[in-house]
From Swiss-Prot:
The keyword Lipid metabolism belongs to this UniProt entry's keyword annotation: yes
Catalytic activity: a CDP-1,2-diacyl-sn-glycerol + a 1,2-diacyl-sn-glycero-3-phospho-(1'-sn-glycerol) = a cardiolipin + CMP + H(+)
Protein name per its UniProtKB record: Cardiolipin synthase (CMP-forming)
Family: Belongs to the CDP-alcohol phosphatidyltransferase class-I family.
Organism the protein comes from: Mus musculus (Mouse)
EC number: 2.7.8.41
Amino acid sequence: MLAWRVARGAWGPLRVALRPPGARLGRGGSRRALLPPAACCLGCLAERWRLRPAAFALRLPGAGPRTHCSGAGKAAPEPAAGGGGAAAQAPSARWVPASAASSYENPWTIPNLLSMTRIGLAPVLGYLILEEDFNVALGVFALAGLTDLLDGFIARNWANQKSALGSALDPLADKVLISILYISLTYADLIPVPLTYMIISRDVMLIAAVFYVRYRTLPTPRTLAKYFNPCYATARLKPTFISKVNTAVQLILVAASLAAPVFNYADSIYLQILWCCTAFTTAASAYSYYHYGRKTVQVIKGK
């Protein structure tokens, strides 16, 4: 009998500590009120039961001020049924707003990995050209072109593979690849210096514009961690039609210049005509970005 009274005396504080928000203790509804609610993670379970440090000296993983589960769309916890007033509502400061959670995206998509592969192949191609190993360079360049075709095809046909990071990473990979190729081919006397200077100048200005757009579209406070976080999407870039044509013409010139020493047509008039076409599309592409300006940038809402 003494042990039973001690057990009943210890159960009282535990019932208060484990009481869900808004539940009333009584003979009829005490057992139903103490049934644990359906929780999707330990963080949600700790939040709903309101475990008090005075009763339990423990901290469940995920019970901190982070998002529970995915965190998307949970601006405030739902009050328990039967409760009223401010006592039945949990503080909303522990939840991440839906607008902030929706700005995060998965950067590890297949198109993004293909774009990073293309960036990694660029110095390999430059080394092969400097060593005048044009046969192997043609094969590596074909592989880089295949990654360019695949990442665009996958991003267009699978919605979960499209990302704001990819809209900037794909043209950045093209510019890194083209810049290294043109510098290497100019060193090998296969492309004239003025054409390479025009292409590099345009790409440097576009890359600087991308960094500026990234800075302007970040919500305050702007931090370096947020600026260089690839998961935090703020804007999508939309290339112009003439820019796509220009990229294709530049890559055609690279392929023709790589094949020129192999098939002995380095002094062909057709190659020189291709130089002029590339210069024209490069200048037209630079003007299109200057003319359309903000139309090429789509700011993601909710920032």
